[in-house]
């Protein structure tokens, strides 16, 4: 889930006791999860990201989870995390 989509996960009960991230301010509407202000957060089979500016980091994480070579993609596209987090 990316941007404000974790609200839907919250409403479905998916975020209970799970770490997540989302668009700034959205976390105030979510009471069950454990908010972390990071570019991408993975907790088990749940992957969340902060918003449109983090879409590439989110995509690279999904590629890695599916067994792809995310690092080669990062290098090839000269990717640099917009928030300065290590990915």
Where are these regions (language model features)?
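Active-site-adjacent pocket-lining segments in enzyme domains
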Residues: 1-87
């Amino acid at each position: 889930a990316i941007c404000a989509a974790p609200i839907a996960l919250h409403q479905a009960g998916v975020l209970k006791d799970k770490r997540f991230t989302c668009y700034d301010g959205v976390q105030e509407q979510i009471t069950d999860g454990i908010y972390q202000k990071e570019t991408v957060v993975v907790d088990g089979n749940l992957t969340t990201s902060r918003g449109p500016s983090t879409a590439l980091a989110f995509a690279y994480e999904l590629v890695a989870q599916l067994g792809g070579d995310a690092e080669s993609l990062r290098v090839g596209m000269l990717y640099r995390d917009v928030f300065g987090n290590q990915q």
